[in-house]
Amino acid sequence: MKESQRPVVVLGSATGDIVLRVPELLHESEYWEAEEIDRQVGGCAFNVARALCRLQAPVVNGIFVGNGTWGERVATEMEQLGLQVTLRHPTKDNSWCFAMMKPDGKRIYVSVPGCDDAWHQDRLATIPLPGQGYLYASGYELANVKAGDLRQWLLDSPAGLTLVLDFGPRLIDIDPAFIQALPVERTLLSLNKDEVALLCGAGDTLIQARRYANEQGFTLIARVGAEGAWICQPNREPEYVPAYMVKMEDRIGAGDAHCGGMLAGLSQGMSLRDAVDLGNRVAAIVVSRPGANGAPTKDELTDFSVD
């Protein structure tokens, strides 16, 4: 590890993704035939860890490996990335899901839960937390009714760790009291348009994100899709970071790729704006490839060109 790099603790799940392409999203009592696009290991945390590893950022692995077919594949892919397995479940396999995708990139997910809800104090205590660095977690874990120990563990994490939280579509299920208890001075929230509306209020994304940052004290990264992202920090003018235009294959894992790229930049000591720009670049590459596993290596990032 380079001395200038700070470690990133990645906490969450690895899931099996079976990606299907359908002509339109399904309705009751209808029959459709789907095209199988791929079978991949995904999951928010694993997607973030994969992006970090490919960009050679130091990762502390807080992702469960299950006991089953998907668990074997997760362990193999972790080994290929150079990630040491730290959490194993003795009986349950990893979660897996169908990702059903329309030609325009819109998709729905059907998930089969696995070992990813076993966040007990004794297991969390085995994750080696650095005194300085970053700690990533997603809303899929934070919203789980069994995740009380996990939420408290995050709140009790070392003061030198910046929490980078991507609530995702489970934001609606996360206890507002937990969000209010977060240490605002060291918490960064990454949200897409829908999540900004849910957390900050309906209306113009930038206006609402800026207001929330000023009133609540959080730093927000408001991801606005093909337009790029806004950085909203308390009592500061928002900063716009434009997107990179590419031919889109699908949007699976785009938000995870953005978080991974941004965290890689922060780990290297980049300014927040430059780190968000790196997140935009990594996300652009991922959406130009099928599925969520297209995070670039350093060489691929250097060779990246836009349309």
Predicted regions and their residues:
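Ribokinase/PfkB-type carbohydrate-kinase core domain
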Residues: M1-A14, A75-H89, K102-Y240
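Glycine-rich phosphate/adenosyl-contacting loop at the front of the ribokinase-like
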Residues: M1-F64, T69-R73, M248-E249
